[in-house]
């Protein structure tokens, strides 16, 4: 309990809780691996290798011929020299550095040519002079300054020496400059007079370090057995960084509304790379769940409403013409003796038996000429003019007199689609007095039932009566072809408009030409440059003074 009062104790407990429950529960994306660091043998990759051979007098001719040159040849045999791998540079140094194989030359990329040049050192170069390692390292730095080396290639320097350089400080300075520019330096010591501490320090190994992969030494007799493991250790030492690849597009969210997850993947290029990641996604807010509403039950009526003739009758819509009327069903109980045809002669029944059947006027047969309906108008022409909403359709010309209606009551039965025109012969039956008074009136026949345009005279009627060989099928009159007449009128109007425009343009052209020759000022645009004022005057008027030039003529000068 005393620990609870200690602030430091509480802080430590909070940090432990934060590390266990919060830090370990971080998002998965924080553990994504996008880059991999790995080690690879440099000898199989792009490398610019600089081989520096000590040719000082301390090596002696015997060791040069039997050990030093064969050591260099064995080292080159282990290298992969080609355009896309290792490029070789070789120089020998004694008093000064001498270039043997130039970097990026043919021998630098061809192992056979490089071995021929190294084998020639047995006869062309003999050990002599001092150990000028500083000049040899300076030649390597010049390649970097002149950008002779490849930018994407690893830079490796391998030194074969048997002793201590002339200037230790200068050699260390040059080695530090190369190391700062990313160049690795490896030293292979040969013989009994080598300085192990200096060589380890030259390659960057601290004296307290145990094993140094960039340094190895051997006696002259065992040099061929040591160079192989040494070069393998040097090649493995190079560390590289590789990218794990590009991610694919995100997948759609796992839900259509609310919170869900989405993921994306990529191809694994190296071991240890992350291949798939997930993250949360949120879509639009989900709508509320549908729930059925509680609908109260309606109580049924104890006494249902009666249906039948006493139910409410729906009134028919006005101004609607039935092109196919149905004949009213006859009532066998009423009017058996008065109406043998079965039609209801009651004009205004108080209670119609069937409200769905439209009101029909009685149809009087032909033999009942004495019975005249009470609703026959005195002037049938006025009645015909009121029925203007009924569309007109011509009837066949071959209708005979027997097919014509004999009763005015049939007029109200709609024909499909044009009712027959009231003729004078029907007026004769309905109103005999009017026929007697108008004795000069023309009595039409069945031929006059055809529809005619306005303005037709009686000559055409007589022609139709004279020649009865009319075609059986009715022919449409010119006024019954509105589409053809309309097209013909439109084409005639187009020609008229085009002719008017052409005539107007011709008149304008003639008026312009006339105006050009009649009015002098109209020809001004077609004239050349205006002549000077003196040139327009005559010879006798050029010497006149300005007041005399503009003086009005005297009375005697007008003639």
From Swiss-Prot:
There is a cross-link at residues 77-78 (Isoglutamyl lysine isopeptide (Gln-Lys) (interchain with K-? in Factor 3(A))). Residues 48-234 form the VWFA domain. Residues 283-292, 370-400, 444-459, 466-495, 548-559 have a biased composition (Basic and acidic residues). Disulfide bonds join 244-273, 253-281, 257-286. Residues 516-559 are cytoplasmic. GO terms for biological process: cell adhesion. It is a single-pass membrane protein. SUPFAM superfamilies: TSP-1 type 1 repeat, vWA-like. Glycans are attached at residues 132, 310, 460. Residues 280-496, 523-559 are annotated as: Disordered. Residues 1-25 form the signal peptide. Gene3D superfamilies: Thrombospondin type-1 (TSP1) repeat, von Willebrand factor, type A domain. It is found in: Cell membrane. The chain crosses the membrane at residues 497-515. It comes from the Eukaryota. The keyword Nucleus does not apply. Residues 241-287 form the TSP type-1 domain. GO terms for molecular function: heparin binding. Keywords: Cell adhesion, Cell membrane, Disulfide bond, Glycoprotein, Heparin-binding, Isopeptide bond, Malaria, Membrane, Signal, Transmembrane, Transmembrane helix. Its main location: membrane. GO terms for cellular component: plasma membrane. Residues 26-496 are extracellular. Residues 536-547 have a biased composition (Acidic residues). SMART domains: TSP1, VWA. PANTHER family: ANTHRAX TOXIN RECEPTOR, LYSOZYME. This is Thrombospondin-related anonymous protein. It comes from Plasmodium falciparum.
């Amino acid at each position: 309990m005393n620990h609870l009062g200690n602030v430091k104790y509480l802080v430590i407990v909070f940090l432990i809780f934060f590390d266990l429950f919060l830090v370990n529960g971080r998002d998965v994306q924080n553990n994504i691996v996008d880059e991999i660091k790995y080690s690879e043998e440099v000898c199989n990759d792009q490398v610019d290798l600089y081989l520096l051979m000590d040719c000082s007098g301390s090596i002696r001719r015997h060791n040069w011929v039997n050990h030093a040159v064969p050591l260099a040849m064995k080292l080159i045999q282990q290298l992969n020299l080609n355009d896309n791998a290792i490029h070789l540079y070789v120089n020998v140094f004694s008093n000064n550095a001498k270039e043997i194989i130039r970097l990026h030359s043919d021998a630098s990329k061809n192992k056979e040519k490089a071995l021929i040049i190294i084998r020639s050192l047995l006869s062309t170069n003999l050990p002599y002079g001092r150990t000028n390692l500083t000049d040899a390292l300076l030649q390597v730095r010049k390649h970097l300054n002149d950008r002779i080396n490849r930018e994407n290639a690893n830079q490796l320097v391998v030194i074969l020496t048997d002793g201590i350089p002339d200037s230790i400080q200068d050699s260390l300075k040059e080695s530090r400059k190369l190391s700062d520019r990313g160049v690795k330096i490896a030293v292979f010591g040969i013989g009994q007079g080598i300085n192990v501490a200096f060589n380890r320090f030259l390659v960057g190994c601290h004296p307290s370090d145990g094993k140094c992969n960039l340094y190895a030494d051997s006696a002259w007799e065992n040099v061929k057995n040591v160079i192989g493991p040494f070069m393998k250790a040097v090649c493995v030492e190079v560390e590289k960084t590789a990218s794990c690849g590009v991610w694919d597009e995100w997948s759609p969210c796992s839900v259509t509304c609310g919170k869900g997850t989405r993921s994306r993947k990529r191809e694994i290029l190296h071991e240890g790379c992350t291949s798939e990641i997930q993250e949360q996604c949120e879509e639009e807010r989900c709508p509320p769940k549908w729930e059925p509403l509680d609908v109260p039950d309606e109580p049924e009526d104890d006494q249902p409403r009666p249906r039948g003739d006493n139910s409410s009758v729906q009134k028919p819509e006005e101004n609607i013409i039935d092109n196919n009327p149905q004949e009213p069903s006859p009532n066998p109980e009423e009017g058996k003796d008065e109406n043998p045809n079965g039609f209801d002669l009651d004009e205004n029944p108080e209670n119609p038996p069937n409200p769905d059947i439209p009101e029909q006027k009685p149809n009087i047969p032909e033999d009942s000429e004495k019975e005249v309906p009470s609703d026959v108008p005195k002037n049938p022409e006025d009645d015909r003019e009121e029925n203007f909403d009924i569309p007109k359709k011509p009837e066949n010309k071959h209708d005979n007199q027997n097919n014509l209606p004999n009763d005015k009551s049939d007029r109200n039965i709609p024909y499909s689609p044009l009712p027959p025109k009231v003729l004078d012969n029907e007026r004769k039956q309905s109103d005999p007095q009017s026929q007697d008074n108008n004795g000069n009136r023309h009595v039409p026949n069945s031929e006059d039932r055809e529809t005619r345009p306005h303005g037709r005279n009686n000559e055409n009627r007589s022609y139709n009566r004279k020649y009865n060989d009319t075609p059986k099928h009715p022919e449409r009159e010119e006024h019954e072809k509105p589409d053809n007449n309309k097209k013909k009128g439109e084409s005639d109007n187009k020609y008229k408009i085009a002719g008017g425009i052409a005539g107007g343009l011709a008149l304008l052209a003639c008026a312009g030409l006339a105006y050009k020759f009649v009015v002098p000022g109209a020809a001004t645009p077609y004239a050349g440059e205006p002549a000077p004022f003196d040139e327009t005057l005559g010879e006798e008027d050029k010497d006149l003074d300005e007041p005399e030039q503009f003086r009005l003529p005297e009375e005697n000068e007008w003639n």
